[in-house]
Design a protein with these regions (language model features):
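Secondary-structure junction motif
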Residues: 185, 199-220, 251, 296-306, ...
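Beta-alpha-beta core module
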Residues: 162-168, 173, 235-292
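Short beta-strand-to-loop elements that line the ligand-binding cleft
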Residues: 129-137, 156, 203, 223-235
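A short LG(V/I)-centered, amphipathic sequence patch enriched
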Residues: 51-70
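Flexible hinge/capping segments at coil-to-helix
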Residues: 164-201
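Short helix-boundary/capping micro-motifs
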Residues: 21-37
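Alpha-helical linker/hinge and terminal dimerization helices associated
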Residues: 53-54, 75-97
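Central regulatory/effector-binding core of bacterial HTH transcription factors
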Residues: 101-161
């Protein structure tokens, strides 16, 4: 068949080339079909399609059995080489995906490391030879990621688009009010009124958590006095437990310090009233930041591990701490 220069050239499919190589090597349509696990009609159809698409006769049908023509022999040699390289490519890619990464450096905020960290270590044990888990506050961790000292960053900072990096939203948690277990909460109370009964314990504004809480209070209760400030959850909640103050915190932080949290009373913000209306919810979202070219498919595996771990912890939070399940929401986006 004579082709015009304007005709679009469609390369042979892998199946067609596989049938041709099998036919040449076995010497018959029936043997080729047996090797490939398809029908004899399928092999014959592939050969006809090859001849039509290439515009060349591949078999000399004047002989018995038929033999490849010069064009057919050239196609056989090149098709065999292509199929061999494709098979090698598949195996090397699969081997790479199965192989262990030599070192994974994962940075995360303290509350994540203390609660989700153990599940991450177990889940990654079969995927990496060495795991370095670095915890701290968002600004320091972000700097380490920017300097390529971390491969993965779990952060509550809002994503900032940048070349060569990607983000996955993992889960969100809403803040709630932690008060001493025997504290009698006045009906329809505001945070400002409660801070007059017990001092308000603040997280350090060096952390994203402290900045979120301070911004929230500035919008709704700017007159709350700031006397106590903490970098860590443990000392903050220990003082609340001892009836020395109240604080806004999250389920993850409560679980991190559950020794203290089990002796606290936790109230959703929406149960309080500000100027006669329920307080709006305050939440923080955890994101995974990574470099796709470096992490590859492991990124989705890590995200899946986190989501599974959060769902499991959510059941425990509800059972042990008696906090509503809907304060935690897992982001299922891929």
């Amino acid at each position: 068949m004579k082709k015009r220069a304007s005709d679009k050239v469609v390369p042979p499919s892998w199946e067609q080339m596989g049938s041709w190589v099998a036919l040449v090597e076995t010497g018959s349509v029936s043997a080729a079909a047996l090797r490939l696990g398809i029908s004899q009609a399928g092999v014959s159809q592939h050969v006809r399609q090859l001849e039509e698409s290439l515009g060349a006769s591949l078999l000399d049908r004047t002989t018995r059995p038929a033999h490849p023509t010069a064009a057919g022999q050239r196609l056989y040699e090149q098709a065999r080489d292509l199929l061999s390289r494709a098979s090698h490519m598949t195996e090397t890619v699969r081997a790479l995906s199965r192989s262990k990464r030599s070192l994974l450096r994962l940075g995360c905020v303290d509350s994540f490391a203390a609660t989700i960290g153990p599940q991450m270590v177990r889940g990654l044990a079969g995927r990496v030879q060495r795991l370095r888990l670095v915890s701290g506050i968002n600004p320091g961790l972000a700097e380490q990621f920017d300097n390529h000292q971390l491969d993965v960053l779990i952060t509550t900072d809002d994503p900032k688009p940048a070349a060569g990096r990607a983000y996955l939203a993992l889960f969100s948690e809403q803040f709630l009010l932690a008060v001493p277990s025997d504290f009698q909460l006045p009906p329809l109370a505001s945070l400002h009124q409660l801070s007059g009964l017990r001092p308000f314990m603040h997280y350090s504004t060096r952390s994203k958590m402290g900045a979120l809480v301070d911004a929230y209070l500035a919008r709704h209760d700017p007159d709350i006095e700031q006397v106590f400030e903490f970098d860590a959850t443990d000392p903050l909640l220990s003082l609340v437990r001892e009836d020395l103050g109240i604080a806004l915190t999250t389920p993850l932080c409560l679980w991190q310090s559950r020794y203290h949290a089990m002796h606290l009373k936790c109230v959703p913000l929406t149960a309080l009233r500000h100027q006669g209306r329920a307080y709006p919810p305050l939440q923080r979202t955890f994101y995974m930041v990574y470099r796709p070219d470096e992490l590859g498919p492991l990124a989705q595996d890590i995200a899946a591990m986190v989501r599974v771990a959060v769902r499991e912890l959510q059941r425990q939070w509800v059972s042990v701490l008696k906090i509503p399940a809907d304060l935690i929401s897992v982001n299922e986006d891929r």
